[in-house]
Amino acid sequence: MLNSSKSILIHAQNKNGTHEEEQYLFAVNNTKAEYPRDKTIHQLFEEQVSKRPNNVAIVCENEQLTYHELNVKANQLARIFIEKGIGKDTLVGIMMEKSIDLFIGILAVLKAGGAYVPIDIEYPKERIQYILDDSQARMLLTQKHLVHLIHNIQFNGQVEIFEEDTIKIREGTNLHVPSKSTDLAYVIYTSGTTGNPKGTMLEHKGISNLKVFFENSLNVTEKDRIGQFASISFDASVWEMFMALLTGASLYIILKDTINDFVKFEQYINQKEITVITLPPTYVVHLDPERILSIQTLITAGSATSPSLVNKWKEKVTYINAYGPTETTICATTWVATKETIGHSVPIGAPIQNTQIYIVDENLQLKSVGEAGELCIGGEGLARGYWKRPELTSQKFVDNPFVPGEKLYKTGDQARWLSDGNIEYLGRIDNQVKIRGHRVELEEVESILLKHMYISETAVSVHKDHQEQPYLCAYFVSEKHIPLEQLRQFSSEELPTYMIPSYFIQLDKMPLTSNGKIDRKQLPEPDLTFGMRVDYEAPRNEIEETLVTIWQDVLGIEKIGIKDNFYALGGDSIKAIQVAARLHSYQLKLETKDLLKYPTIDQLVHYIKDSKRRSEQGIVEGEIGLTPIQHWFFEQQFTNMHHWNQSYMLYRPNGFDKEILLRVFNKIVEHHDALRMIYKHHNGKIVQINRGLEGTLFDFYTFDLTANDNEQQVICEESARLQNSINLEVGPLVKIALFHTQNGDHLFMAIHHLVVDGISWRILFEDLATAYEQAMHQQTIALPEKTDSFKDWSIELEKYANSELFLEEAEYWHHLNYYTENVQIKKDYVTMNNKQKNIRYVGMELTIEETEKLLKNVNKAYRTEINDILLTALGFALKEWADIDKIVINLEGHGREEILEQMNIARTVGWFTSQYPVVLDMQKSDDLSYQIKLMKENLRRIPNKGIGYEIFKYLTTEYLRPVLPFTLKPEINFNYLGQFDTDVKTELFTRSPYSMGNSLGPDGKNNLSPEGESYFVLNINGFIEEGKLHITFSYNEQQYKEDTIQQLSRSYKQHLLAIIEHCVQKEDTELTPSDFSFKELELEEMDDIFDLLADSLT
């Protein structure tokens, strides 16, 4: 547990007097835990080397080293350091780009007995000079291609160039240099109040303590892949490095080009299967949890996070909010997100092991629970102090009045204990702020600006932009006009990028208090009218217009010209990344480094590149060929094919504005062309027609039920009536109803299934929220750019159906059809009446904890996907319930497979579902492990996730079509719909609890028209709602007793839980042929190979 003292705190908080303080202290600071207190960082690393020498230790791009290889190289370099006089507490500056060599250098310094001083290669010359001078580093380790950075720097120590040829000739065994855990490990420079940065001295023992915390509290193991995101000058890099190298995990170095592109970053995380990453909240806010699949633990640190950000991620990952100054070895407290609703702020949690937290007044007297005070920290992670700053050290590291003989670090942060044992961060007491995760002392920025020959007074303050991100604004008094660019250039010569103010505002004089001090409250809010903006010049072409639109949105400024400077308008590196990300949606590419070099649109436009073709953005009209799933629908000849809908009901406590909704749905139906379909009979065939914008495109009804005591029944009845009113030939296929009630509004939407599917609903919810928000703020409704139309998909799919590449799939389907028997499942009664009105439902659900294991832990055992697990459980259940060893079922998929080159349907609304036969083979049901692996391999062998089966059946030209009998008639249908409820919850609306009449919704209740036919004997649907897995079994009551289906449901749950427990308990990941792309290798053959290997290695 990350917070073991919570219950004790609650018990102790109501005591009185001195005894209360003792109880209180014991409760909140009872964090003592064993850790290797006598061991240094490099000794702990060497232990991992001896345990797992061949495990991958570190990866950068296409280069990687095992633990053994990394250790050898570090030992070789350490010997060079020792020869050149590096020893105990000797400081070595490290100025290298992110690379494996950088981390070899750090380990080598520690192994030699020294301490390293990280220096960012992007620091201005003056800052590099100051750090080297102040630290009195005996040596500077750098790379050959960076030597130019120190040509103009006065450095009296040795410069060591990292060269592989020089290093590799040295002895590579461990050195055994005498060292203690209280030796200095590193000195990190952070912003200081005197105008210069200050160095904080950290000892080995703080990291030794964290090693146990990583393993026991964060559950990091050798199987994890740790992302290395932070700059070397930021102590988060120390956290990332040793989270991996002291636990046997692998460290993945993420380069700047990847970090500066949100799309690239998300792709990298997935491709490298990163499992644990630490990021500033200001970066996470631009990432999409739906697109990042491998992360299991997300840690945010460096600045305050928000409840909305936590809510966005907590269902997908273990979300941890961490807090800790550099002076306390990176981390002092952590908070783990739970299922409970988060209040107005996100806590920073409770103290980690061997750490004590005290919230005190100015006299170091404890504050009561709920009272604000200064947060002070004690424990094993405390720094030795500030390098060569004894006075500052004595001010900040004071005697601990609660533990004699120990020190206490006064953070300058204001906080308070909450009643549940967590801490709420309330801000700073002094003028220190956090910008993009970095500590910034405002006085340091002010003192640098005062060095300018024409500036007589200055004040720097922090503000928040329209995205609630902090930025700096500098106010100055000068008798002369100083060009903005000159000020930025002047600042950049001494300050790192994150400390350069976003705004510079020249004042005639500073506002003063009655005491003659600068009155910061009276400083004007940053506004372009105070800036030094050039005359407005309008965009001249489409790309410049696009850039203007994106800049206005990202910077929150209404009117931007092509001569305006991005940074003068409040831009920074994070906003530059946002600009690059937004350009992706326009199929345009920008390197963020170009925006740094060319900060005006008229300069930048020359460096914008086309990334790929754009989808047609016009209105789609005309006849469209039916896709396979639509062919299937009309082939069924349902009694009432007009009533075959999907529907949703949304709820908004504050109500919906009818006029806004009309504008929003007009835009949505215009934007998503498929919603305007109708279907005509012509010459014995069904013709699909995409209407233009003429006529009625959706029906909208309003009901005022504010005075009605039976609102739920009325809503159900009216919804059912609307469900039954859709006409495929006349249209529209979209029906909307707004129900006003005393407690808020319910918004009903019914759309015929022919033009919508589960993914389409996600798109529609997103667009509904976006458009409604825009309209509420009197903005023009602007939806994301269209992807390829349903019409284009249909055309290209028909071409694909007759392509040589596709026809190669025939062999698989031919074999499946000829060698698979149709097996009928047992039934209680014989009936020919398969109407929807006879359908009943039985359901089962897992707990939140069981579901979390299924989603986050199970797949690691065999590298499975969730369908592999759910279908294996179904196979076991059917075996037990009906004594069937082998049965074919119908499996549904989303159907949006990437089979058509250059075709993009990511945001296209329509019915794309695929369905295909899958065999559940349970002939070795006594071997759980084997059955999981067999299910996985059988599913992986299906070409392109089954989309081809019905393409052959309905689209391939008859003379090309292989001889496929299509004789398989599954009686069971299975469809896992995913985590659907989270897509409905937005800040605007949530899912309504009220019934919508008969609909084919994602809850598995496929009632449809009561007179319509049921097309499977058993229809099984799975979905996640409120953190729980739900499985529903729909059946015909004239075929089955309820108890019979209950037996199947219970059996399914029992086997699913057994599989979850089996996988969670399994320590090692077991690979199967598909993990190696061995398409022809059978599972048994691979097991034999592994057995042979195991025998040969023992």
Curated annotation (Swiss-Prot):
Pathway(s) annotated for this protein in UniProt: Antibiotic biosynthesis; gramicidin S biosynthesis
EC number annotated for this UniProt entry: 5.1.1.11
- GO molecular function (one): ATP binding
Q: Which residues carry this modification: O-(pantetheine 4'-phosphoryl)serine?
A: S573
Key words, A-Z:
Antibiotic biosynthesis, ATP-binding, Isomerase, Ligase, Multifunctional enzyme, Nucleotide-binding, Phosphopantetheine, Phosphoprotein
What is the UniProt remark on how the cofactor binds and its stoichiometry?
Answer: Binds 1 phosphopantetheine covalently.
Assembly and partners are described as: Large multienzyme complex of GrsA and GrsB.
Functionally, this protein is described as follows: In the first step of peptide synthesis this enzyme activates phenylalanine and racemizes it to the D-isomer.
Instruction: Tell me what this protein is called.
Output: Gramicidin S synthase 1
Could you tell me which species this protein originates from? Aneurinibacillus migulanus
User: Taxonomic lineage of this organism?
Assistant: Bacteria, Bacillati, Bacillota, Bacilli, Bacillales
